[in-house]
Amino acid sequence: PDITPPNFVSGTISYDDSISSGGRRIILTLSETIDLTPISLVNISCFILSENGVDDIVILDGATATGIDGLTLTIEMTESQRVLSVLASNTPGGDGSGIRINFLKGGVQDIGTLQNLAQTNLSLTEIADVRSPTLLSQAIDYDTGILTLTFSETIDTTPKSLVIPGSMYIGQTSNLAGAVQLTEDTTTAVN
């Protein structure tokens, strides 16, 4: 009989939304084949990102697990989970400490239905977010004068001096001829 539970042995976390860079995913490798059929066998709330193995930063509840029976499990983080992870990472935008992952008992099971045991402080290889955000849409409220910009990922507006309205122009075409340069420095972040 199978008496050895699955153990997490390595992992990679990608902070970049680009599919070629990993696409906001955590890829975990295990010591033996895990049962991912159906994928609902994965209890995603048992996966916790940590800065030092002790202080929890992000419980991955709400993330999406994918994979087939095998040695790897892929977890796609939500945008807010990705942002919180970047802040505690050893990549640009982070605090230099690096991300680790903790596992509660019962996150996955092997083919013999043995669940993983609790495990802490697994170091993750980090892939930096190197892709610039893309402007997806914009809207002007002519009654209030508020310009709302929507981007492909979270924009760091803390402190607000990181946003430079003077570098933005409003116009009817992609060139700057006839465009109006923004000068007001009132910036408000909205999730």
Predicted regions: what is each one?
Residues 1-191:
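Non-catalytic beta-sheet/beta-sandwich ligand-binding modules that flank or precede catalytic cores
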